[in-house]
Amino acid sequence: MSETPRLLFVHAHPDDESLSNGATIAHYTSRGAQVHVVTCTLGEEGEVIGDRWAQLTADHADQLGGYRIGELTAALRALGVSAPIYLGGAGRWRDSGMAGTDQRSQRRFVDADPRQTVGALVAIIRELRPHVVVTYDPNGGYGHPDHVHTHTVTTAAVAAAGVGSGTADHPGDPWTVPKFYWTVLGLSALISGARALVPDDLRPEWVLPRADEIAFGYSDDGIDAVVEADEQARAAKVAALAAHATQVVVGPTGRAAALSNNLALPILADEHYVLAGGSAGARDERGWETDLLAGLGFTASGT
């Protein structure tokens, strides 16, 4: 197929794209694919690492969201994506915070009118016409309310984008997304990667997670696809994570990173997926696709 492949990743906050799909995004952009990332909020309720940005948080100046626009822009540039896309425009819906976070605004993403959120994403899908859409599983990966809601909104938008044409809620020509994936954490890959870390990879304050702290991962038999990126793509992922400096610290060797909880996780080149919609392409001996574009008529290189 001579057409340029198009992939769309839908995430809740800045940094989610790099943590979950950084190597995948870099893998496809380096092969000439058109990749876009939609971010649903500015991540205003995020914690920050260290004192340097402490006054930006919601409890102080409440300027973290605006600052994170710059972080996301730099991270996407490292991954080969030209610019971020914010659902409804930057700042339209606010980070809802973790479960139990005080409601600071009537614009919380989880409280938004679904006609508006789904409609905004349908418009993006119909404009970009992606061959692949990626978002979280129904649990939002680890259960963050915005991640769960992003799954709900994206699932509804993928379905609605292919139905009808030119309505007030869903303008534009319909587009049926050929393949729809959930991004998931491959548990065995994470455990193997964590076991391979050595003290030189870690900062002194970091600890390796216990098994119950990574219980949201998927076993191998629950996975449908893997993107096994090369070292160049993994290096781009490291650079993207480093760009999210309010949220992520990359270790001294670039083999591990941690959030504000100081749990050290390996920075993996392999990223895993579950096929939620569309037909699978060729699978390997593990029963996994090794290309999200498999079965769509593109060449093995993804272009």
Swiss-Prot record:
One of its GO terms (biological process) is mycothiol biosynthetic process. Keywords: Hydrolase, Metal-binding, Zinc. Gene3D superfamilies: LmbE-like (3.40.50.10320). The keyword Disulfide bond does not apply. Pfam families: PIG-L. It catalyses: 1D-myo-inositol 2-acetamido-2-deoxy-alpha-D-glucopyranoside + H2O = 1D-myo-inositol 2-amino-2-deoxy-alpha-D-glucopyranoside + acetate. Partially inhibited by MSH when MSmB is used as substrate. Competitively inhibited by the GlcNAc-cyclohexyl derivative 5-(4-chlorophenyl)-N-((2R,3R,4R,5S,6R)-2-(cyclohexylthio)-tetrahydro-4,5-dihydroxy-6-(hydroxymethyl)-2H-pyran-3-yl)furan-2-carboxamide, which also inhibits Mca. Binds 1 zinc ion per subunit. The keyword Zinc applies. Homodimer. Belongs to the MshB deacetylase family. Catalyzes the deacetylation of 1D-myo-inositol 2-acetamido-2-deoxy-alpha-D-glucopyranoside (GlcNAc-Ins) in the mycothiol (MSH) biosynthesis pathway. Shows some amidase activity toward S-conjugates of mycothiol. This is 1D-myo-inositol 2-acetamido-2-deoxy-alpha-D-glucopyranoside deacetylase.
